[in-house]
Amino acid sequence: MKVTFLGHAVVLIEGKKNIIIDPFISGNPVCPVKLEGLPKIDYILVTHGHGDHLGDAVEIAKKNDATVISNYEICHYLGKKGVKTHAMHIGGSYLFDFGRVKMTPAVHGSGILDGDSMIYGGNPSGFLITIEGKKIYHAGDTGLTREMELLAEENVDVAFLPIGGNFVMDVEDAVRAAVMIKPKKVVPMHYGTWELIFADVELFKKKVEEKGVECVILEPGESLEL
């Protein structure tokens, strides 16, 4: 199974089924691929309604007849646009044909910008994905939360954590999160897309590895094999 970081918070999981998380492809200044360069997508996971995460979900879903997995409010919004969805809420889990997805808490917003209007997008979340014998945690956009301590019991193989500050955890808080979660590997995300969320990723790697957590810095387009 191949897990590819496509910049910002976009993660592509290629295995028996292909899954993309927070598919912000068009307009993403650090994404190395275009929509037509994606493989066939079976499922789309959306952590919250902001445009840099909801991204191209509608176009990808319609092109691939893919199912979007997200909270109830986002699924309702997408369903009105003709997209196939599976609604969940935080704390809920469901066994799909590729594995199990559990929605985890995130501290952030989730408004959907639709023209000049902001539509309520439910509660933001992360995802704990159990797939092909591995566990992948994608935190979504979030500040540091005590709930992350519970993830230490999950024996997470790889955790994708935001480190860019301002809207999400900064380097220091992301290190604290990694220490609480205790993943086998941590991959930093949601940094450097724009100047406002610049972060010193090498400093994050140094600090988190001093705490005993292996850090893998993936440049956009680079992959991990799990």
Curated annotation (Swiss-Prot):
Gene3D superfamilies: Ribonuclease Z/Hydroxyacylglutathione hydrolase-like. It holds the Pfam family Lactamase_B_2. Signal peptide: none annotated. Keywords: Hydrolase. It comes from the Bacteria. InterPro entries: Metallo-B-lactamas, RibonucZ/Hydroxyglut_hydro, UPF0173, UPF0173_UPF0282_UlaG_hydrolase. GO terms for molecular function: hydrolase activity. Belongs to the UPF0173 family. NCBIfam families: PRK00685.1. This is UPF0173 metal-dependent hydrolase TM_1162. It comes from Thermotoga maritima (strain ATCC 43589 / DSM 3109 / JCM 10099 / NBRC 100826 / MSB8).
